A protein has these predicted regions:
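A basic- and aromatic-enriched beta-loop-alpha substructure that forms the phosphate/nucleotide-
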Residues: 42, 52-55, 59, 83-94
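Short, flexible/disordered intra-domain loops and linkers
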Residues: 13-14, 42-57, 183
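Active-site regions of metal-assisted phosphoester/phosphodiester hydrolases
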Residues: 1-34, 68, 73-261
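Short, conserved active-site loops that position catalytic residues or coordinate cofactors/metal ions
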Residues: 30-33, 37-46
Length: 261
């Protein structure tokens, strides 16, 4: 099973449509089964097309581009988390080729006010792959030392939805650097959660942030992770869209993995 996670930084990028087209091309070429995206936005004032999806929804435009490339197997889920940059409904999304058996979304932040930019939501779906049920989560969590919305609270809320009798794959921007000891990364790993990167036979340096971006100063960091509650057989886990493996299309790099089921 091939999987990908990316914080899209959507509608904050120059040449955004070109970057959506490039993302669609790579998804098509690499034949991913599941993609988890974060910072998937649509304009507050744009026209509603169906359900909660508006005409400039990043995921909707990505889907249309995939269809243009002849890829018609994907289904997507999108959930509005909070207002971003005063003009966007920012959310999280999952894209998959496989039948979605169940879906849900839930808050992990203390706040449930969608006008507050620190409000955090998770989207989850259940699929079947090679006759095996798998639960997939797209995650965007807060910072370790945030006094209003601390990471511990959010991680605990997330893990309440991770069931021992399910194979769970948690993908996304965890906003906690895996290179730092005794902070958010160690906290969640100590809850019997496995890092796919650590399990992988083949891997690179794992860096998904270089230099300064929103709220982060100048260090190389591994914020974007693929985690599981099970010891899975992982062929590789590598960074993509970093200028070395694929063009840069966001202020985060993506992470892809191949897992054997």
């Amino acid at each position: 099973m091939r999987i990908l996670t990316l914080n899209c930084h959507s509608w904050q990028e120059e040449k955004q449509i070109e970057k959506i087209k490039y993302l669609a091309k790579i998804i098509h070429q690499n034949n991913y089964d599941i993609i988890a995206l974060q910072e998937v936005s649509q304009s507050i004032n744009s026209k509603v097309l169906f359900d909660n999806i508006k005409e400039d929804n990043f995921m909707f435009i990505l889907m249309k581009e995939l269809e243009r490339l002849g890829e018609t197997r994907f289904k997507f889920l999108w959930e509005f988390a909070h207002i971003g940059y005063d003009k966007y409904e920012e959310g999280i999304s999952i894209l998959t080729k496989h039948h979605i058996k169940a879906k849900e979304s839930f808050y992990v932040s203390k706040s449930k006010d969608q006008n507050y930019w620190k409000t955090r939501k998770i989207i989850k779906c259940k699929i079947v792959y090679n006759n095996k049920p798998i639960s997939v989560y797209s995650c965007h969590l807060g910072w370790w030392d945030d006094k209003e919305e601390d990471f511990k609270f959010q991680a605990n809320k997330l893990l309440e939805h991770v069931k021992e009798d399910e194979t769970c794959i948690l993908m996304g921007d965890f906003n906690n650097d895996a290179f730092l000891s005794n902070e958010g990364y160690d906290y969640i790993i100590d809850k019997n959660i496995k890092d796919i990167y650590s399990l992988a036979k083949s891997k690179d340096n794992g860096v998904t942030i270089i230099g300064k971006i929103d709220s982060w100063e100048g260090n190389n960091m591994r914020l974007d992770l693929i985690l599981s509650n099970k010891n899975l057989k992982v062929e590789y886990c590598k960074v993509i869209f970093n200028g070395i493996r694929g063009e840069i299309i966001s202020d985060h790099f993506g992470v892809e993995a191949k897992i054997e089921f």
